Amino acid sequence: MVKLNKFHVFMSLTCVYAVFLFYLSSLSSLPGPPELGFLYGLVHFLEDLGLKFLIYPFYFAYRYPDKFAHVILYMGFGLLLNQTLSSSKNGVLSEYAVPFSLLIGTLYGVTDEFHQVFVPYRSASSMDLCADFMGLLFAQLLILVYFGIKRVLSEGRH
């Protein structure tokens, strides 16, 4: 019986996620954003309270929902890629998981955009690729910040 280790689990999850991304880009028309009527009410409510500034971080998601979706989806992909490479027995891959995650994720994004050229009513977009890269980059930064904080906290205990 084969014993699954951390690498095999993350590799499987990463491959399933890549297939999910491929499936999404194979659809001729993606599901539209949900009804945002309640958000307009929330914005007006926060304006009345003088707290409209709380909405500013979400402006990008409101203005460019498709690019925001790319960022979020590829951030998940970047997290999985990093964990897969970090748990690899290959010393180079595990030591340089961040740049390799960016490289592999970006190459996957390029092939995904190329694939969309052949999907009816879809097209390749350099802006989508930029959003994919930003998601991958945010994931790596999140991981670096997490482990940096973890290291500082562990040093503070000693």
Q: What kind of feature is each model-predicted range?
A:
Residues M1-P120, S126-M127, F133-H158:
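Bulky hydrophobic segments
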